[in-house]
Amino acid sequence: MQHVKIPQDRIGVLIGEGGETMREIEAEAEVRLDIDSENGSVAVETVGDPVRGLKGPEIVRAIGRGFSPDEALRLLEDDMMLFDVVDIDAASRNKNDMKRKKGRLIGEGGRTRELMEELTGADVVIYGSTLGIIGAPQEVDAVRSAAEMLLDGAPHGAVYSFLEEKHNEMKHQGLEYHRFPGGQS
């Protein structure tokens, strides 16, 4: 059994309307969730396939870091799917610096975050003081590198070029998990 702590304001998302989301996670990941809504602690116990069960705590953590339940459940699509977090706070000197860096990661009208998703195929969420990433290893690496470049002060243009390059590399390796608006893969 593993214990995962998530923010209070994400407990409702984890449980879902009438407990629907919680039941879906339990069924898909073959785990049992015991949620303490008082302190945000979630006990995750594997009840079925241990390999799927290992993804249970990651799914809960991903929802806690701002992902929708559907995005978090992508972790079960394939054994290679990863969940990673970039700590914006650790790369910041103070609150104002963190706000500025968060703004750089989001971009004007959310464009930078959108481009990270479009060019890599990963899901990217900025919540609180973290940037969360869900995707295949190459996708996660590309987003993490782009985020670190932006946090280190690289110009947006250079980061977009880097992402285009990674996109083309993945495409040539046949690893393009590109998703198009409308939900068709």
Give the label of every model feature segment.
Residues 1-185:
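RNA-contacting regions in translation and RNA-metabolism proteins
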